[in-house]
């Protein structure tokens, strides 16, 4: 495709992805001569559109895999999706509800058919979104958490853990959704601050002598109270420990027990214990062997243990119960109280802590294994490193994990109950006399199968599988810091338990994508951004570059349309520079003609030197995952140096008569642009492919081109200082012209008083650049120059730049400008003098740093003296 005058992302990106995929560029090659690099995509839920967080995740992963492919690795970027138990089931049920049906009307088998249809529809939609983002995925290895291979892995893990005593069935307090009627994982519970009430009640002593004050936010749970606890160190209650109180309304006697869990400073210092409806109370109940009384059913209605409140909704019961207590003069006070209340992410229901018989994973031994691994050479590196402390803290404080869910969509638990004896059979296959058994109806928590993702996707439990042998462990996991516990930690302990290896070498953690004002993006706030809309407007390359470079590891990213647009402008700049270069290189120029051994100009040497420095910096920063710094490095090199300076300087030989110099310039343009496109390619795959295809090149695609390497033969350190001097001179002339409102089209004399003979010779040898950028009517460069009385002077590192001002300037204005400049150098001198006078700095700082400060002092002093001299001259 040709380079059209205007950059149009839709035209550039159209059809390119299909060409890459159909050509097999993203397929892992199983080339034994190459080192492997593997990333398995964090599987998105098959519930709808990908959000900006997914786009951020996958862009970073794609950058890493594209870069490693170019660096010669056998690269596998494995795609896949998650069945997302409750989320998908809720969507399918909502669709059925629109038809006036429930899942129970269909039955389990028919409902699951509907769920699989949903999965197929949305899986295609997700693939389309991956394509628009340009992700280099190996679709021949795509996996799904409910596919046959992963189901086999899930069954084996469950059975093995059960046989090891790591999975058990028992009673525990879980998060319960009374609308969806299922247990929830902690990540499926959204905590919101709500305005509620704090109720203070009287619990009368059984002996009739007074009462003890109890406070609660959930009065309806008091019907299940089985004790009162106080802190044994609380002087107020030492004499009542062992006594009993009467539970209001119900009349049940409750013992007063001592437990150090109670906070003496909070409320009255006495706490009711409801072991069946609060996780902390459950633990207290275990310590004191208390009865567990469940007072609600699975729908959130009060059950037969709730006496006269049976059949009432829990919140209606709360209201009536408080009225009844008021009637009996047992309410001390009711306070307004803002507190955090958990809501189901899917149904919106207020989550009920609920005692239920569920399947659990015994976490302590698994957590200890993960913690111990972090003390070995096989440890996992967290980026940023501070998140290892977060990981360790969660592992140390871990509780057993509820893994059963009262759903139909998911991995059905491989456990069967004997119809007559109640015996439990757990196995990878059903019992032989299946007619005597019934399978557990529950399914496993989605995170159970997701925890096996890095190795189950590669063929495990077949440890001889080619992909498992070659591509596991994986190299990097890229994900948000908000799921370190829910997913990252679980993959780590399952990887160690079942493969004996860490599942990935590095964990790169990013933050949340926030709205521009810093608020979290959400449907309720209406501030969400669809990444596909951004791509339609600005192109995938603009969005990818913004996501990759807009933040540093571990930090949140604020979405900004203005910043995406500025990157679109950056790509426009690249496009225009490339188009100019390609037009000047010419169609007949081939890659074999690139020759950098000839008589290189200063500009050639400088841009080649800066290119090599940029290659080195970008490679090092990428290896550290510092993509924000990579973005700044590439932006500065491409925009500030290649486009603004070298492209303009290349016009001198290209517009000249010297064919040899033209050929050298073509070589430099080709070499620099080719290497720059390769560096940019992982970030901006579409536009770089388009430009690269129009350059003289070897190979069929930039996807498979080699990553740039530093070429020491093309590093000319002296060129940087000379170019800096020239750029300073050119900028000072342009600034001076601006200040006196003199356009570049008007030729004026320019005098340069060089610091010494060497600088003078260098400037004379490169005066063509000053001519090109400054348009002087005459240019004088010498070490001694008689400066006109009325002149504008700028002090640069090369010397003084003088523009005669006769008829051009207001003298008073120029003196004021110079006095401001003098003040600037005075402040810099004061700062550096204080630093060098600081004994602590001089004694502790490295010698190199001290010398740099001394050099700064000398430079500032020279500039200060030069400006002061000009002020005196003008005033005279």
UniProtKB/Swiss-Prot annotation:
Keywords: Aminoacyl-tRNA synthetase, ATP-binding, Coiled coil, Cytoplasm, Ligase, Nucleotide-binding, Protein biosynthesis
Coiled coil, from the record: 806-876
Record has Protein biosynthesis as a keyword: yes
Subcellular location: Cytoplasm
Subunit structure, as described in the record: Monomer.
Enzyme's top EC category: ligase
Protein name: Valine--tRNA ligase
Matches recorded under CDD domains: Anticodon_Ia_Val, ValRS_core
Motif extent ('KMSKS' region): 520-524
Protein source organism: Staphylococcus saprophyticus subsp. saprophyticus (strain ATCC 15305 / DSM 20229 / NCIMB 8711 / NCTC 7292 / S-41)
Residue positions binding ATP: 523
Entry EC no(s): 6.1.1.9
Pfam assignment, any one: Val_tRNA-synt_C
Gene: valS
Catalysed reaction, written as an equation: tRNA(Val) + L-valine + ATP = L-valyl-tRNA(Val) + AMP + diphosphate
Biological process according to GO: valyl-tRNA aminoacylation
